[in-house]
From Swiss-Prot:
Organism name: Pyricularia oryzae (strain 70-15 / ATCC MYA-4617 / FGSC 8958) (Rice blast fungus)
Gene designation: LAE1
Family stated for the protein in its record: Belongs to the methyltransferase superfamily. LaeA methyltransferase family.
Subcellular location per the Swiss-Prot or TrEMBL entry: Nucleus
Protein name: Secondary metabolism regulator LAE1
Role of this protein: Secondary metabolism regulator that controls the expression of the tenuazonic acid biosynthesis cluster. Methyltransferase that performs automethylation. No other methyl-accepting substrate has been identified yet.
Length: 327
């Protein structure tokens, strides 16, 4: 396996600028069950805001790059000179910065929006980061550079209360007809075509999904519902890819085994942060209960015998706005 790529490890492009956004100050963070969380928006966003979480997000960026055969976006999107690109929930900013590197030195603009400002201090001149709750009115930085050629949204299930409202907002800020919206989501319901699901993993998945349902930010992934919402809230030409994510290297082909190795690594880094706050705050489980569940799930993830044939599904949706839509 290749090393995990981080935004801070990328070479500095000529003309790089200092980011205007600082990392969260100590008073903006609070500690809970051994992890750091951002004070705002405490009652909504349930994932940590520490370095360990940043590393986890970068593992998924690497996984998606492998799935896309070393590309940064799907073939539906065209990013070229003078393109404007928006990344919703940009995390560490790795994807945004990689996009800027790919197009350098052509003029373009890449904007990353997130509730957590954990991106590098030194960034390409074509990159901007803005602190934003993307369900609230968008920031001036986001609005003034619309319409966009590409709006990217990855792994935002569990962070959004109203997908229809967000889809309408995205459609309103996308270039009519030519602009593309891309959404990547993992269905965390484990599957196996020829055997049972490992019990601890099934329990982990069931309980986290129940907690996030109660929290009002479901992580469930319904293909038909997503397609219907996109079509009913401003989009046309909706396309979907369904990709198997083996949770270990049991696939018969080398590409499947490589995806399995990376997803196994990502899953190992995800069971605890994805369950800690939901089970503690929403389901009122004790730290000991959560720790024991995660240790049991982790043992299964690390066991080839338990994971043989087990997988999740990754769904990639691409969509354009209707020809008649105008901002």
């Amino acid at each position: 396996m290749d090393k995990v790529l981080h935004a801070t490890s990328l070479p500095i492009l000529p003309g790089a600028i200092m980011s205007k956004n600082d990392a969260p100050e100590v008073e903006q963070l609070f500690k809970e069950n051994g992890r750091l969380y951002q004070v705002w928006p405490r009652d909504r966003y349930l994932l940590p805001a520490d370095q360990t979480e940043q590393d986890r997000l970068d593992i998924f960026s690497q996984l998606f790059k492998i799935i896309l055969k070393e590309k940064l976006h799907t073939d539906a999107s065209r990013v070229e000179e003078n393109s404007h690109v928006l990344d919703l929930g940009c995390g560490t900013g790795l994807w945004v910065i990689l996009m800027a590197h790919e197009l350098h030195p052509k003029p373009s603009l890449f904007i990353g929006a997130d509730v957590q400002m954990t991106q590098p201090d030194l960034i390409p001149a074509t990159v901007r980061f803005t602190p934003a709750d993307i369900e609230a009115p968008w920031t001036d930085e986001m609005v003034q550079h619309a319409p966009y050629d590409l709006i990217n949204c990855r792994l935002m299930k569990g962070a959004i209360r109203s997908w229809p409202a967000l889809y309408e907002k995205i459609a309103a800020h996308l270039k009519p007809e030519t602009g593309v919206f891309e959404q990547f989501e993992i269905d965390w319901q484990f599957r196996c075509d020829d055997g049972p699901i490992p019990p601890a993993l099934k329990q982990w998945s069931d309980e986290v999904m129940q907690a996030m349902d109660q929290h009002g930010m479901s992580i469930r992934c319904n293909r038909e519902e997503t397609r219907s919402m996109l079509l009913n809230h401003g989009f046309d030409d909706v396309q979907e890819q369904a990709i198997v994510l083996p949770i270990s290297n049991w696939a018969e082909d080398e590409r499947g085994r490589e995806i399995g190795r990376w997803f196994n690594l990502a899953l190992n880094h995800s069971t605890l942060p994805m369950s800690l706050a939901p089970l503690f705050r929403v389901m009122k489980k004790t730290p000991q209960y959560i720790d024991e569940l995660n240790k049991a799930a982790s043992r299964e993830v690390c066991s080839q015998a338990h994971t043989d044939g087990v997988y999740c599904m990754l769904y990639i949706w691409t969509a354009r706005t209707r020809p008649s839509r105008r901002r």
